[in-house]
Design a protein with these regions (language model features):
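Acidic helix/loop microenvironments that form the catalytic cleft of cell-wall polysaccharide enzymes
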Residues: 190-192
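Amphipathic alpha-helical segments of tetratricopeptide repeats
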Residues: 176-177
Length: 192
């Protein structure tokens, strides 16, 4: 009974086709605008009202002190490690990375994709991963655990003792090299 495959589960093998890749790429994009694992978009959004506008001094929280009081800590540069906005930003970075990495793993095994579309999707995914880690570097610094599609889930060998800036730049360079401006390849408006 321990060898039974769970029912109702989408495996990477089941998604290793053109349609599955498109679904996974859409899932990666969805992390930009919708909650990932229950986070509040105010707390972790890459649009950065809190971690850009408030933290950078371009915006004020406003309202009264009891309304999103944890934002006051960020605005006053007095953020405690228990501040939920910090946790949610961390979760967002790694949930985005996980979505992108799964899509990249499946993309390599999808045999029914046209090569130019495969390269375009790879470029989009590399851009999204670079964005996620860039957001992480803005809040946590450049020494973050960098997880890419070659890492196994729960890999104990992922360390945070290396500056990941060059890895993020490499993802951006890969994205630029693979993205296309051909409407037939791009597909939907609004993609990277």
């Amino acid at each position: 009974f321990l060898g039974k495959e769970p029912q109702g589960v989408l495996t990477p093998e089941a998604l290793a086709n053109a349609q599955g890749v498109e679904l996974l790429v859409t899932s990666a994009y969805a992390g930009l605008a919708s909650p990932v694992e229950g986070y509040d978009p105010y707390q972790a959004s890459p649009f950065n009202w809190v971690w850009g506008g408030i933290y950078g001094g371009d915006a004020n929280k406003g309202s009264d002190p009891n309304d999103q009081s944890t934002v006051n800590e960020i605005e006053l540069y007095n953020t405690l490690s228990t501040n939920g906005y910090i946790k949610q930003k961390w979760v967002w970075v790694y949930q985005m990375s996980k979505r992108v990495n799964l899509a990249l793993q499946v993309l390599e095994n999808a045999e029914d994709m046209k090569e130019e579309i495969r390269q375009m999707r790879k470029g989009e995914l590399k851009f999204l991963r670079a964005l996620a880690y860039f957001e992480g570097m803005r809040v946590f610094g450049v020494y973050l655990p960098y997880i890419d599609e070659t890492n196994q889930e729960n890999d104990p060998k992922v360390h945070n003792d290396k500056d990941i800036y060059s890895l993020v730049v490499a993802d951006v360079d890969d994205a630029i090299a693979n993205l296309s401006d051909d409407p037939e390849v791009v597909g939907e408006v609004g993609r990277a």
